[in-house]
Curated annotation (Swiss-Prot):
GO molecular function: ATP binding; myosin heavy chain kinase activity; myosin II binding; protein serine/threonine kinase activity
Record gene name: mhkC
GO biological process: chemotaxis; mitotic cytokinesis; myosin II filament disassembly; response to differentiation-inducing factor 1
One Pfam match: WD40
Keyword Phosphoprotein attached: yes
Residue ranges, annotated region (Disordered): 310-495
Protein name: Myosin heavy chain kinase C
Amino acid sequence: MEEKKTGAAAALALLNQKFPVADVIAGTKCERAIKWELTIGDDLKPKWTHSIVCVSIEKTPFAKGSCRTAHKLKDWSQPDQGLVGKFSTNKKTTRDSYFTDVLMQTFCAKWAEKFNEAKPPKPITFLPSYVYELIDHPPPYPVCGGEPFIEGDYKKHNNNSGYVSSDARNTPQSFSHFSYELSNHELLIVDIQGVNDFYTDPQIHTKSGEGFGEGNLGETGFHKFLQTHKCNPVCDFLKLKPINQSKKALLRGTLPVVQLMDFHDAIGLNGNGSGPKNNYDMNYFRNGGGAQQPISLDDEEKMLQEQLERIRAQQQQKSKPSPPLVKQPSGNNLHKQQSPSSPTSKPVPQIVKTPSQSNVVNKSPVSPPKENSNVKLEQDNINNNNSSISSNNDNSNNNNNNNDNINNSSNSSSVNSNSSSVSSSSSSSSSSSSSSTTNAAPISIQVSRNSPPPQQPIQPSSAAASASSTSSSNVPTPESTSTSSMEQTPDRSEFEKWDLTSIKNIDTVRGLQSECITGDSLRLYSGSNDGQIGVWDAVELKHVTNIKAHGKSIRAVIKRPGFDQNILTAGADSLVKEWDINTQQTIKEIKESNEVNTIFIQDNLLYTGCNDKTVKVWDMRSYECVKTLSGHTRAIKSVCAMGNLLFSGSNDQQIYVWNLATGTILTNFQGHEGWVKTLYAHNNMLYSGSHDETIRIWDLKTTRCVNTIKCKDRVETLHVTNQGIFAGSGDWLQVFSHDKYENLASLNTRSSILCLWRNQNQLFTGSLASNLKVWSWDKM
């Protein structure tokens, strides 16, 4: 019983961090994978889709063939279905060949539908197939095929060189004959194998011999089949022409040929027998011919959280009865979730004192610039009139945090006498709600989708004034003249008029995958998933060089204000580094306790958000951690600051607003139904983007959500100007007006946008597709 609880706890812990290689849940090794699926709609155009899943693969194969090994595979996005993972034993097998196999099997499934419409004695099915890229391994990532596991005797009925099984059944042979006749002798489907009439791993021969992999033998394959095939009663039943008689135009079959040939055109197969329009090596999809080629890895983890919760749910069911889990909303069930009638309690953010010089490694001595004001931060006790906060213990059922309230202790007092009191409302499971005004403390706001409850305003200036007037508090505040990493380039958008409806792609710069980006008028700097910093010429629009910076993926990169040649990077290797770009050398290095997802600089303060659920405040003069802000229940994905306020967004769907003078929480913004991936503060407004496919706009004067913008996909990154809102929403670059929030433009970039950076009227978008796209628009 104790072991099962441990397994469930391990699964819960993994919800708050990137899923690492070879973690063990209930005795099973698990890892992340990109899952690629091919679908064919009624328009007969193939379309690739992908998601990140959690998989468990048995090391020892349960079957071996001449070309591949078969392993039991568990995909936690389909926890009730057993799968087979197929790995090629040929070292020369390419990544594209796995996608070609999936295309052939999906293509044959379309032919099987037509075969079944003819009402044969036994219908047939080609198993759905997938491609899994195991992304927790060093590049190039291992790849395997996947399909459902079917119990029974596996048999090969024929192959691509004319072989026919001695106990050949009628149905598989007639299907090969059917494909040959119904395509007007343009193609032939062979290598029929599987369990009963569930088929897999087919091969397609085309008349020209082009496309569909190296197994396509062209007319040689036709000849071998014709030599060995013997028509059977199913062939007669389907009224197929006897095999060795010439037939060119007239088909006696009962199925329409035109629709199938339209499908051939959709994938590039010419009806005149000239074969595929492109030699099928996935370039067809890469060039946009009917579908999007899976050319990039998407580091987003849309379904991982839900899958890991399934793991935990299984373990809880085995151990003891437990209340049903409320699943993390995903892109499939947005706006359908119902809030629980009785919200559970949740820990209140607390300050954890962590003075630490030991985790800072000095690479080379650097003299900080002289400042008039002393901003050295000291670790001190919070003033006695600060709030005292009590938090309930977290439990394994605390999964849905949308309506969790923060419990305040009865002996709470006001943060400071000058701060405005804010009402905290809590709703009971019956109907009536009561609100009480306390001077105490952190508040929890219930933000409804349509009508947020009124709150008293947050006043950054008041908080700053109170901090300066409170002599007993030694916690410094940001300087009055604030310089942040969000505002380094002078912004002309306040003075110019832009026509954002005219936005267009003006260039694509090849070079490096980009998860994050920053820059200035001369250079751009991007961070990639292989730990390299990409340096780009922002004027000539070309890739300059790469710098090996981290052992794992770089999650954030920003310029240090006031230091033209210094940038900071943060990575999945738990390191934050400051670099001199001229020398390409590390100046300082911070070792965090967990993966660092986001960093932000304001004045001489560095804020880091990590997978350990905390936000840390660092003095950049001494690189000491002067404050740790705790309270989120899952990984921090975004932080930003404005004046004396700090904002943090998390996988727990919450946005916390912190008072930097005291390190206490002023309020938490609720309403998102997915991970909060990006925050942007602009003109006393906070813009938040989430995996629930929405952007929410929060008025910091009233603490209300004043608008919710529905996007096309999960929102990964935002950039806000005086004239427009730019959002990276899946594969889409979307632009919204700043005043009415109207959708001005939506452009498909064919690769998920992970980062944005703007220089005047040029926008740069980065993805994992090894390029930067450059966008521009007209001035009015």
